[in-house]
Amino acid sequence: MRKLGFFFILLCLSWQGFTKETEEHSEIHDLMAYLLDPAAEAIWDSAGYVITEEGEFNLEPTDQEGWDKVKHGAKVISESSYLLSMPSRAVDDAQWVALSMALKRIGERAFEAAENEDSEELFKVGADLYQVCVACHQTYWIKEE
């Protein structure tokens, strides 16, 4: 009986921690912070050039591991579009779902560019990804007052 009481208390404490955590972050926040943001960064960090005083540096992946990282990010973006489109998460049906499905297409294009090791196409896809992100954030980002 003592063990049962201990497990009950442990369960209550676990639930309290879970509910506190979910109150601080929305599902959309967590989806963005832990899935989409890192996936987008994998694409943006692998396309284009950085110019510094030391010179110009190409961000294109130089090995299979680098291209695989881009492919992973592309798949996460593509498949996350379905998570965003779930009825419980859709802010409004038309525009929200359209922007979510735009991510699907962009993820597929990024994956294809990585498969072909096409850094120029990946750069274009990265620009398109940025535009979709900005369009969504301008419309739906909840600003704290």
Functional labels for PLM-detected ranges:
Residues 1-4:
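Positively charged n-region of N-terminal signal peptides that target proteins for export
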Residues 6-8:
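Sec-dependent N-terminal signal peptides
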Residues 19-127:
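Extracytoplasmic c-type cytochrome modules immediately beyond a signal peptide or single-pass transmembrane anchor
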Residues 129-140:
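The canonical Cys-X-X-Cys-His
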Residues 143-145:
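Short Cys/His-rich "knuckle" micro-motifs
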